[in-house]
Amino acid sequence: MSEGTLYDKVWDRHTVTKLPTGQDQLFVGLHLVHEVTSPQAFGMLKERDQEVAFPERTHATVDHIVPTGNRDRPYRDEAAENMMAELEANVRGSGIDFSDPDSGNQGIVHVIGPEQGLTQPGMTIVCGDSHTSTHGAFGALAFGIGTSQIRDVLATGCIAMEKQQVRKIEVTGELGEGVTAKDVILTIIGKLGTDGGVGYVYEYAGEAIEDLGMEGRMSICNMSIEGGARAGYVNPDETTYEWLAETDAFADDPEKFERLKPYWESIRSDADAEYDDVVTIDGSAIEPTVTWGTTPGQTAGITEPIPDPDDLPEEDRDTAKRAQKHMRVEPGDTMEGYDIDVAFLGSCTNARLKDLREAAAFVEGREVDDDVRAMVVPGSQRVRDAAEAEGIDEIFIEAGFDWREPGCSMCLGMNDDQLVGDEASASSSNRNFVGRQGSKDGRTVLMSPIMVAAAAVTGEVTDVREMEEVATV
Protein backbone atom coordinates (compact mmCIF):
# COMPACT_ATOMS: atom_id res chain seq x y z
CA MET A 1 0.00 0.00 0.00
CA SER A 2 0.97 3.62 -0.50
CA GLU A 3 2.93 5.50 2.14
CA GLY A 4 3.73 9.16 2.67
CA THR A 5 1.15 10.48 0.20
CA LEU A 6 -1.30 13.27 0.92
CA TYR A 7 -4.02 10.65 0.85
CA ASP A 8 -2.31 8.60 3.57
CA LYS A 9 -1.63 11.63 5.77
CA VAL A 10 -5.12 13.11 5.61
CA TRP A 11 -6.77 9.71 5.97
CA ASP A 12 -4.74 8.86 9.05
CA ARG A 13 -5.39 12.22 10.69
CA HIS A 14 -9.15 11.80 10.27
CA THR A 15 -9.40 8.14 11.31
CA VAL A 16 -11.40 7.76 14.52
CA THR A 17 -11.20 3.98 14.81
CA LYS A 18 -10.87 0.74 12.87
CA LEU A 19 -14.26 -0.94 12.46
CA PRO A 20 -14.95 -4.71 12.68
CA THR A 21 -15.86 -4.62 8.98
CA GLY A 22 -12.27 -3.69 8.15
CA GLN A 23 -13.35 -0.18 7.23
CA ASP A 24 -12.12 2.95 8.97
CA GLN A 25 -14.40 5.41 10.67
CA LEU A 26 -13.43 8.85 9.38
CA PHE A 27 -14.34 12.21 10.85
CA VAL A 28 -15.84 14.51 8.22
CA GLY A 29 -14.64 18.10 8.08
CA LEU A 30 -17.24 19.44 5.63
CA HIS A 31 -20.57 18.04 4.53
CA LEU A 32 -22.13 19.68 1.47
CA VAL A 33 -25.85 19.16 0.95
CA HIS A 34 -28.23 19.77 -1.97
CA GLU A 35 -31.90 19.26 -2.68
CA VAL A 36 -31.92 15.93 -4.54
CA THR A 37 -30.05 13.44 -2.34
CA SER A 38 -30.72 14.88 1.12
CA PRO A 39 -34.51 14.66 1.74
CA GLN A 40 -34.52 10.93 2.49
CA ALA A 41 -31.54 11.29 4.82
CA PHE A 42 -33.19 14.08 6.79
CA GLY A 43 -36.34 11.96 6.88
CA MET A 44 -34.40 9.09 8.47
CA LEU A 45 -33.11 11.44 11.16
CA LYS A 46 -36.64 12.56 11.96
CA GLU A 47 -37.83 8.96 12.19
CA ARG A 48 -35.13 8.31 14.80
CA ASP A 49 -35.66 11.64 16.55
CA GLN A 50 -32.05 12.59 15.83
CA GLU A 51 -30.54 15.99 15.14
CA VAL A 52 -27.71 17.13 12.89
CA ALA A 53 -24.55 16.60 14.92
CA PHE A 54 -22.38 19.33 13.39
CA PRO A 55 -24.48 21.96 11.59
CA GLU A 56 -21.46 24.28 11.60
CA ARG A 57 -19.62 21.76 9.39
CA THR A 58 -22.56 21.45 6.99
CA HIS A 59 -23.51 23.74 4.12
CA ALA A 60 -26.44 23.53 1.71
CA THR A 61 -27.38 24.91 -1.68
CA VAL A 62 -29.89 24.19 -4.43
CA ASP A 63 -28.55 23.35 -7.87
CA HIS A 64 -29.85 20.22 -9.62
CA ILE A 65 -33.51 21.12 -10.09
CA VAL A 66 -33.45 24.91 -9.80
CA PRO A 67 -34.64 26.67 -12.98
CA THR A 68 -32.03 28.68 -14.83
CA GLY A 69 -34.68 30.82 -16.49
CA ASN A 70 -37.80 31.98 -14.64
CA ARG A 71 -37.19 31.64 -10.89
CA ASP A 72 -40.49 32.98 -9.61
CA ARG A 73 -41.84 30.87 -6.77
CA PRO A 74 -43.55 28.50 -6.81
CA TYR A 75 -41.51 26.89 -9.57
CA ARG A 76 -43.43 25.72 -12.63
CA ASP A 77 -42.19 22.17 -12.02
CA GLU A 78 -44.11 20.92 -8.99
CA ALA A 79 -41.49 18.29 -8.12
CA ALA A 80 -38.76 20.94 -8.19
CA GLU A 81 -40.80 23.24 -5.97
CA ASN A 82 -41.43 20.43 -3.48
CA MET A 83 -37.74 19.52 -3.29
CA MET A 84 -36.80 23.15 -2.82
CA ALA A 85 -39.35 23.64 -0.05
CA GLU A 86 -38.24 20.47 1.72
CA LEU A 87 -34.58 21.49 1.59
CA GLU A 88 -35.44 24.92 2.99
CA ALA A 89 -37.32 23.35 5.89
CA ASN A 90 -34.65 20.76 6.62
CA VAL A 91 -31.65 23.06 6.68
CA ARG A 92 -33.30 25.94 8.52
CA GLY A 93 -34.72 23.56 11.08
CA SER A 94 -31.22 22.22 11.66
CA GLY A 95 -29.30 25.49 11.77
CA ILE A 96 -27.38 24.71 8.57
CA ASP A 97 -26.02 27.56 6.45
CA PHE A 98 -27.92 27.72 3.18
CA SER A 99 -26.80 29.39 -0.04
CA ASP A 100 -30.33 29.87 -1.35
CA PRO A 101 -31.34 31.74 -4.53
CA ASP A 102 -32.03 34.93 -2.56
CA SER A 103 -28.63 34.94 -0.84
CA GLY A 104 -26.44 35.99 -3.74
CA ASN A 105 -24.35 32.88 -3.01
CA GLN A 106 -26.41 30.13 -4.66
CA GLY A 107 -24.79 27.92 -7.23
CA ILE A 108 -23.61 24.45 -8.08
CA VAL A 109 -22.39 22.84 -4.88
CA HIS A 110 -18.90 22.14 -6.25
CA VAL A 111 -18.52 25.74 -7.36
CA ILE A 112 -19.71 27.50 -4.22
CA GLY A 113 -17.64 25.41 -1.79
CA PRO A 114 -14.30 26.52 -3.24
CA GLU A 115 -15.31 30.11 -3.97
CA GLN A 116 -16.55 30.68 -0.41
CA GLY A 117 -13.44 29.14 1.14
CA LEU A 118 -15.38 26.23 2.63
CA THR A 119 -13.08 23.85 0.74
CA GLN A 120 -9.59 23.78 2.24
CA PRO A 121 -6.49 21.56 2.02
CA GLY A 122 -6.30 18.60 4.34
CA MET A 123 -10.04 18.36 4.88
CA THR A 124 -12.29 15.37 4.46
CA ILE A 125 -15.30 16.47 2.41
CA VAL A 126 -18.42 14.54 1.47
CA CYS A 127 -21.54 15.29 -0.53
CA GLY A 128 -24.37 13.26 -1.99
CA ASP A 129 -23.07 13.87 -5.49
CA SER A 130 -20.71 11.91 -7.72
CA HIS A 131 -18.50 14.86 -8.58
CA THR A 132 -17.51 15.75 -5.04
CA SER A 133 -13.98 14.81 -6.08
CA THR A 134 -13.80 18.36 -7.51
CA HIS A 135 -12.66 19.61 -4.09
CA GLY A 136 -9.57 17.42 -4.27
CA ALA A 137 -8.03 20.18 -6.38
CA PHE A 138 -7.27 21.91 -3.08
CA GLY A 139 -5.55 18.93 -1.51
CA ALA A 140 -8.69 17.68 0.22
CA LEU A 141 -10.03 14.13 0.31
CA ALA A 142 -13.48 14.54 -1.19
CA PHE A 143 -15.95 11.73 -1.78
CA GLY A 144 -19.41 11.37 -3.23
CA ILE A 145 -21.70 9.41 -0.91
CA GLY A 146 -25.13 7.76 -0.94
CA THR A 147 -28.29 8.51 1.00
CA SER A 148 -27.63 6.21 3.96
CA GLN A 149 -24.14 7.67 4.28
CA ILE A 150 -25.59 11.19 4.19
CA ARG A 151 -27.78 10.15 7.11
CA ASP A 152 -24.76 8.80 8.98
CA VAL A 153 -22.74 11.97 8.46
CA LEU A 154 -25.65 14.21 9.46
CA ALA A 155 -26.19 12.17 12.63
CA THR A 156 -22.59 11.53 13.69
CA GLY A 157 -20.18 13.66 11.65
CA CYS A 158 -18.41 10.44 10.67
CA ILE A 159 -18.44 7.97 7.81
CA ALA A 160 -17.28 4.37 7.38
CA MET A 161 -14.97 3.91 4.39
CA GLU A 162 -12.48 1.43 3.01
CA LYS A 163 -9.03 2.79 2.26
CA GLN A 164 -8.06 2.78 -1.41
CA GLN A 165 -4.79 2.42 -3.26
CA VAL A 166 -3.10 5.53 -4.68
CA ARG A 167 -2.18 5.95 -8.32
CA LYS A 168 0.03 8.89 -9.25
CA ILE A 169 -0.75 10.31 -12.67
CA GLU A 170 2.08 12.51 -13.89
CA VAL A 171 1.25 14.79 -16.80
CA THR A 172 4.60 16.01 -18.05
CA GLY A 173 5.55 18.85 -20.34
CA GLU A 174 3.65 21.94 -21.44
CA LEU A 175 0.14 21.94 -22.87
CA GLY A 176 -0.14 23.25 -26.40
CA GLU A 177 -2.23 26.01 -27.92
CA GLY A 178 -5.95 25.51 -27.44
CA VAL A 179 -5.41 22.58 -25.04
CA THR A 180 -7.09 22.79 -21.65
CA ALA A 181 -7.48 20.88 -18.41
CA LYS A 182 -10.65 19.32 -19.86
CA ASP A 183 -8.61 17.84 -22.68
CA VAL A 184 -6.15 16.46 -20.13
CA ILE A 185 -8.77 14.62 -18.09
CA LEU A 186 -10.60 13.32 -21.17
CA THR A 187 -7.26 11.98 -22.40
CA ILE A 188 -6.54 10.32 -19.05
CA ILE A 189 -9.94 8.63 -18.95
CA GLY A 190 -9.60 7.61 -22.58
CA LYS A 191 -6.26 5.93 -21.88
CA LEU A 192 -7.07 4.28 -18.53
CA GLY A 193 -10.76 3.57 -19.10
CA THR A 194 -13.92 4.30 -17.15
CA ASP A 195 -13.12 1.47 -14.74
CA GLY A 196 -9.34 1.86 -14.74
CA GLY A 197 -9.42 3.71 -11.44
CA VAL A 198 -11.59 1.27 -9.51
CA GLY A 199 -9.97 0.71 -6.12
CA TYR A 200 -7.79 3.80 -6.50
CA VAL A 201 -7.56 7.43 -5.57
CA TYR A 202 -5.74 9.49 -8.21
CA GLU A 203 -2.97 11.94 -7.34
CA TYR A 204 -2.45 14.33 -10.25
CA ALA A 205 1.07 15.72 -10.62
CA GLY A 206 3.66 16.82 -13.17
CA GLU A 207 4.52 20.08 -14.87
CA ALA A 208 1.28 20.33 -16.83
CA ILE A 209 -0.80 19.99 -13.65
CA GLU A 210 1.36 22.39 -11.66
CA ASP A 211 1.00 25.02 -14.39
CA LEU A 212 -2.80 24.93 -14.18
CA GLY A 213 -4.81 27.44 -12.18
CA MET A 214 -7.28 26.22 -9.58
CA GLU A 215 -10.11 26.21 -12.11
CA GLY A 216 -8.25 23.76 -14.33
CA ARG A 217 -7.30 21.56 -11.40
CA MET A 218 -10.94 21.46 -10.32
CA SER A 219 -11.99 20.36 -13.82
CA ILE A 220 -9.54 17.47 -13.68
CA CYS A 221 -10.41 16.32 -10.17
CA ASN A 222 -14.12 16.70 -10.97
CA MET A 223 -13.98 13.90 -13.54
CA SER A 224 -11.89 11.46 -11.50
CA ILE A 225 -15.05 9.49 -10.79
CA GLU A 226 -15.65 9.12 -14.54
CA GLY A 227 -12.40 7.17 -14.67
CA GLY A 228 -13.57 4.85 -11.89
CA ALA A 229 -11.44 6.43 -9.15
CA ARG A 230 -12.95 7.00 -5.70
CA ALA A 231 -11.44 10.48 -5.62
CA GLY A 232 -8.69 12.61 -7.09
CA TYR A 233 -6.48 15.33 -5.70
CA VAL A 234 -3.63 17.74 -6.38
CA ASN A 235 -1.06 18.61 -3.73
CA PRO A 236 -1.58 22.17 -2.45
CA ASP A 237 0.96 24.79 -3.50
CA GLU A 238 1.28 28.55 -3.90
CA THR A 239 -1.43 28.54 -6.57
CA THR A 240 -3.77 26.96 -4.01
CA TYR A 241 -2.81 29.38 -1.26
CA GLU A 242 -3.29 32.44 -3.47
CA TRP A 243 -6.85 31.31 -4.27
CA LEU A 244 -7.67 30.59 -0.63
CA ALA A 245 -6.32 33.92 0.61
CA GLU A 246 -9.00 35.75 -1.38
CA THR A 247 -11.97 33.67 -0.22
CA ASP A 248 -14.50 34.53 2.49
CA ALA A 249 -12.72 32.27 4.95
CA PHE A 250 -9.46 34.23 4.92
CA ALA A 251 -9.79 37.58 3.13
CA ASP A 252 -10.55 39.36 6.41
CA ASP A 253 -8.53 37.05 8.63
CA PRO A 254 -4.96 36.77 7.33
CA GLU A 255 -3.78 35.55 10.73
CA LYS A 256 -6.01 32.49 10.43
CA PHE A 257 -4.55 31.87 6.99
CA GLU A 258 -1.00 31.99 8.33
CA ARG A 259 -1.90 29.63 11.19
CA LEU A 260 -3.28 27.02 8.83
CA LYS A 261 -0.70 27.25 6.08
CA PRO A 262 1.93 25.11 7.88
CA TYR A 263 -0.63 22.31 8.20
CA TRP A 264 -1.49 22.57 4.52
CA GLU A 265 2.18 22.35 3.61
CA SER A 266 2.72 19.37 5.92
CA ILE A 267 0.14 17.18 4.18
CA ARG A 268 1.78 17.38 0.76
CA SER A 269 3.00 14.03 -0.49
CA ASP A 270 6.58 13.39 0.56
CA ALA A 271 9.30 13.49 -2.07
CA ASP A 272 9.94 9.79 -1.39
CA ALA A 273 6.29 8.81 -1.06
CA GLU A 274 5.42 5.31 -2.22
CA TYR A 275 2.56 4.78 -4.67
CA ASP A 276 0.68 1.67 -5.65
CA ASP A 277 0.93 2.63 -9.30
CA VAL A 278 2.39 5.43 -11.41
CA VAL A 279 1.20 6.47 -14.86
CA THR A 280 3.00 9.07 -16.99
CA ILE A 281 1.33 10.99 -19.80
CA ASP A 282 3.06 13.43 -22.15
CA GLY A 283 1.05 16.63 -21.82
CA SER A 284 2.70 18.18 -24.86
CA ALA A 285 1.20 15.41 -27.02
CA ILE A 286 -2.38 16.10 -25.91
CA GLU A 287 -4.60 17.86 -28.43
CA PRO A 288 -8.15 19.21 -28.10
CA THR A 289 -10.07 16.09 -27.13
CA VAL A 290 -13.76 15.18 -27.42
CA THR A 291 -15.94 12.15 -26.85
CA TRP A 292 -17.23 10.14 -29.80
CA GLY A 293 -19.39 7.70 -27.85
CA THR A 294 -21.64 7.40 -24.83
CA THR A 295 -19.12 7.16 -21.99
CA PRO A 296 -16.42 9.67 -20.97
CA GLY A 297 -13.85 7.01 -21.83
CA GLN A 298 -14.81 6.89 -25.49
CA THR A 299 -12.60 9.81 -26.49
CA ALA A 300 -10.36 10.89 -29.32
CA GLY A 301 -8.15 13.82 -30.10
CA ILE A 302 -9.81 16.09 -32.64
CA THR A 303 -7.54 14.80 -35.43
CA GLU A 304 -7.61 11.15 -34.33
CA PRO A 305 -9.83 8.58 -36.05
CA ILE A 306 -12.76 7.02 -34.25
CA PRO A 307 -11.67 3.44 -33.46
CA ASP A 308 -12.95 0.32 -35.14
CA PRO A 309 -14.75 -1.68 -32.41
CA ASP A 310 -13.15 -4.86 -33.73
CA ASP A 311 -9.74 -3.42 -32.87
CA LEU A 312 -10.71 -2.84 -29.22
CA PRO A 313 -10.43 -5.33 -26.35
CA GLU A 314 -13.20 -7.89 -26.60
CA GLU A 315 -15.01 -6.60 -23.52
CA ASP A 316 -15.31 -3.12 -25.09
CA ARG A 317 -16.49 -4.06 -28.57
CA ASP A 318 -20.26 -4.33 -28.09
CA THR A 319 -20.37 -1.11 -26.06
CA ALA A 320 -18.43 0.71 -28.77
CA LYS A 321 -20.71 -0.60 -31.54
CA ARG A 322 -23.83 0.54 -29.67
CA ALA A 323 -22.25 3.90 -28.94
CA GLN A 324 -21.29 4.50 -32.56
CA LYS A 325 -24.78 3.58 -33.72
CA HIS A 326 -26.35 5.95 -31.20
CA MET A 327 -23.98 8.80 -32.04
CA ARG A 328 -24.16 8.13 -35.80
CA VAL A 329 -20.41 8.02 -36.27
CA GLU A 330 -18.25 5.67 -38.30
CA PRO A 331 -14.88 4.05 -37.52
CA GLY A 332 -12.02 5.84 -39.22
CA ASP A 333 -13.77 9.21 -39.28
CA THR A 334 -12.75 12.03 -36.96
CA MET A 335 -15.18 14.05 -34.83
CA GLU A 336 -14.20 17.25 -36.63
CA GLY A 337 -17.17 18.40 -38.68
CA TYR A 338 -19.76 16.54 -36.56
CA ASP A 339 -22.95 18.64 -36.73
CA ILE A 340 -24.32 19.98 -33.46
CA ASP A 341 -27.68 21.51 -32.58
CA VAL A 342 -27.01 22.74 -29.04
CA ALA A 343 -24.00 24.33 -27.34
CA PHE A 344 -23.99 24.10 -23.55
CA LEU A 345 -21.38 25.98 -21.54
CA GLY A 346 -21.87 25.17 -17.86
CA SER A 347 -21.77 22.44 -15.16
CA CYS A 348 -19.58 21.83 -12.11
CA THR A 349 -16.78 20.86 -14.49
CA ASN A 350 -16.51 24.09 -16.45
CA ALA A 351 -18.67 27.04 -15.37
CA ARG A 352 -16.26 29.15 -13.35
CA LEU A 353 -15.28 32.72 -14.13
CA LYS A 354 -12.06 31.76 -15.93
CA ASP A 355 -13.96 29.30 -18.12
CA LEU A 356 -16.43 32.02 -19.11
CA ARG A 357 -13.70 34.61 -19.67
CA GLU A 358 -11.79 32.37 -22.05
CA ALA A 359 -14.87 31.31 -24.00
CA ALA A 360 -16.06 34.92 -24.21
CA ALA A 361 -12.67 36.08 -25.49
CA PHE A 362 -13.04 33.58 -28.31
CA VAL A 363 -16.70 34.39 -29.01
CA GLU A 364 -16.27 38.17 -29.11
CA GLY A 365 -16.90 39.45 -32.61
CA ARG A 366 -18.41 36.15 -33.73
CA GLU A 367 -22.00 34.91 -33.95
CA VAL A 368 -23.70 31.66 -33.01
CA ASP A 369 -24.58 29.56 -36.05
CA ASP A 370 -28.19 30.00 -37.17
CA ASP A 371 -28.96 26.32 -36.59
CA VAL A 372 -27.57 26.20 -33.04
CA ARG A 373 -29.22 27.12 -29.76
CA ALA A 374 -26.51 28.08 -27.34
CA MET A 375 -26.60 28.76 -23.63
CA VAL A 376 -24.20 29.85 -20.93
CA VAL A 377 -25.06 28.83 -17.37
CA PRO A 378 -22.66 30.33 -14.79
CA GLY A 379 -21.68 28.03 -11.95
CA SER A 380 -22.86 30.37 -9.21
CA GLN A 381 -24.45 33.73 -8.54
CA ARG A 382 -21.03 35.09 -7.67
CA VAL A 383 -19.62 33.88 -10.97
CA ARG A 384 -22.58 35.41 -12.80
CA ASP A 385 -22.23 38.74 -11.00
CA ALA A 386 -18.48 38.89 -11.61
CA ALA A 387 -18.94 38.03 -15.28
CA GLU A 388 -21.57 40.72 -15.68
CA ALA A 389 -19.28 43.25 -13.99
CA GLU A 390 -16.71 42.49 -16.70
CA GLY A 391 -19.25 42.67 -19.53
CA ILE A 392 -18.89 38.98 -20.33
CA ASP A 393 -22.67 38.53 -20.42
CA GLU A 394 -22.98 41.17 -23.13
CA ILE A 395 -20.39 39.42 -25.29
CA PHE A 396 -22.28 36.14 -25.12
CA ILE A 397 -25.69 37.75 -25.63
CA GLU A 398 -24.51 39.78 -28.63
CA ALA A 399 -23.11 36.59 -30.15
CA GLY A 400 -26.47 34.84 -29.74
CA PHE A 401 -26.02 32.84 -26.54
CA ASP A 402 -28.73 32.63 -23.90
CA TRP A 403 -27.35 34.00 -20.60
CA ARG A 404 -28.97 32.14 -17.70
CA GLU A 405 -29.15 31.87 -13.92
CA PRO A 406 -26.79 29.42 -12.15
CA GLY A 407 -27.57 25.75 -11.71
CA CYS A 408 -26.72 22.30 -13.01
CA SER A 409 -28.89 22.99 -16.06
CA MET A 410 -28.35 20.78 -19.11
CA CYS A 411 -25.68 18.66 -17.45
CA LEU A 412 -28.53 16.34 -16.50
CA GLY A 413 -32.18 15.95 -17.46
CA MET A 414 -33.54 17.01 -14.07
CA ASN A 415 -34.73 20.53 -14.86
CA ASP A 416 -36.14 22.55 -17.75
CA ASP A 417 -32.88 22.64 -19.76
CA GLN A 418 -32.89 19.50 -21.89
CA LEU A 419 -32.14 18.17 -25.34
CA VAL A 420 -35.13 17.52 -27.58
CA GLY A 421 -35.42 14.43 -29.74
CA ASP A 422 -32.15 13.44 -31.38
CA GLU A 423 -30.42 16.80 -30.93
CA ALA A 424 -26.64 16.71 -30.68
CA SER A 425 -24.94 18.91 -28.10
CA ALA A 426 -21.45 20.26 -27.68
CA SER A 427 -21.22 20.22 -23.90
CA SER A 428 -18.66 21.31 -21.31
CA SER A 429 -20.19 18.94 -18.75
CA ASN A 430 -18.85 15.61 -17.50
CA ARG A 431 -21.20 12.82 -18.62
CA ASN A 432 -22.41 11.76 -22.04
CA PHE A 433 -24.51 8.74 -21.11
CA VAL A 434 -27.58 7.98 -23.23
CA GLY A 435 -30.41 10.16 -21.91
CA ARG A 436 -28.14 12.17 -19.61
CA GLN A 437 -29.22 15.51 -21.07
CA GLY A 438 -32.92 14.73 -20.97
CA SER A 439 -33.69 12.92 -24.22
CA LYS A 440 -33.10 9.20 -24.74
CA ASP A 441 -32.25 9.96 -28.37
CA GLY A 442 -30.07 12.97 -27.60
CA ARG A 443 -26.37 12.89 -28.44
CA THR A 444 -23.74 14.51 -26.22
CA VAL A 445 -20.18 15.37 -27.21
CA LEU A 446 -18.03 16.36 -24.23
CA MET A 447 -15.37 19.01 -24.77
CA SER A 448 -13.70 22.06 -23.24
CA PRO A 449 -15.47 25.44 -22.90
CA ILE A 450 -13.46 26.97 -25.73
CA MET A 451 -14.29 24.00 -27.96
CA VAL A 452 -17.98 24.48 -27.08
CA ALA A 453 -17.64 28.12 -28.12
CA ALA A 454 -16.05 27.09 -31.42
CA ALA A 455 -18.81 24.55 -32.07
CA ALA A 456 -21.47 27.14 -31.30
CA VAL A 457 -20.23 29.56 -33.95
CA THR A 458 -19.44 26.97 -36.63
CA GLY A 459 -22.36 24.62 -36.03
CA GLU A 460 -20.06 21.62 -35.85
CA VAL A 461 -17.27 20.11 -33.77
CA THR A 462 -14.28 22.22 -34.72
CA ASP A 463 -10.55 22.16 -34.05
CA VAL A 464 -10.28 25.42 -32.16
CA ARG A 465 -6.61 25.66 -33.07
CA GLU A 466 -7.57 26.32 -36.67
CA MET A 467 -9.47 29.46 -35.73
CA GLU A 468 -7.98 32.85 -34.98
CA GLU A 469 -7.06 34.28 -31.59
CA VAL A 470 -6.92 31.09 -29.58
CA ALA A 471 -5.23 31.37 -26.19
CA THR A 472 -3.57 28.52 -24.32
CA VAL A 473 -5.80 27.87 -21.29
Swiss-Prot record:
Q: Which species is this record about?
A: Halorubrum lacusprofundi (strain ATCC 49239 / DSM 5036 / JCM 8891 / ACAM 34)
- The keyword Iron-sulfur is assigned to this record: yes
Q: Which residue stretches belong to region Disordered?
A: 289-319
Q: Name one GO biological process term.
A: L-leucine biosynthetic process
Gene3D superfamilies hit by this protein: Aconitase, domain 3 (3.30.499.10)
* InterPro entries named among the record's database cross-references: 3-IsopropMal_deHydase_lsu, Acnase/IPM_dHydase_lsu_aba_1/3, Acoase/IPM_deHydtase_lsu_aba, Aconitase_4Fe-4S_BS, Aconitase_4Fe-4S_dom, IPM_dehydratase_rel_enz, IPMI_cat
Q: Which GO terms describe its molecular function?
A: 3-isopropylmalate dehydratase activity; 4 iron, 4 sulfur cluster binding; metal ion binding
Catalyzed reactions? (2R,3S)-3-isopropylmalate = (2S)-2-isopropylmalate
User: How does it associate, per the subunit comment?
Assistant: Heterodimer of LeuC and LeuD.
Q: In which pathway does it act?
A: Amino-acid biosynthesis; L-leucine biosynthesis; L-leucine from 3-methyl-2-oxobutanoate: step 2/4
Q: Which top EC class applies here?
A: lyase
What the entry lists under NCBIfam families is as follows: leuC (TIGR00170), PRK05478.1 (NF004016), PRK12466.1 (NF009116)
Q: What is this protein called?
A: 3-isopropylmalate dehydratase large subunit
